[in-house]
Amino acid sequence: MKKIYDMLKLENIKILPGVKDWREAIHVAVKPLVDGGYCEERYGDEIIKNTEKLGPYYVLCENVALIHGSTEQGVIKRQIAITLLKEPVKFKEDGYDVRI
């Protein structure tokens, strides 16, 4: 069984000034996973499709979103990436500000 610290690599942690919108936030958040071979290129687009269909169900609370997907959406191996935004982004107009 993989331990959580085995699924979080230093190269998958990013601190960024901000993004233009929630779609860009998803793409920059999954980029380290794509680059590392943990998911397919389409992974970010699949999460965006789910968000457009179901809403931002992964926004847990103020400042925190836990975007995720499945093998059907392009996940190859389990891995965690953390993206910290200095300027928050909203995943819906009346929703929480998200930084992580």
Identify the residue ranges that each predicted region occupies.
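Cytosolic covalent-transfer regions centered on His/Cys nucleophiles
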Residues: 1-100
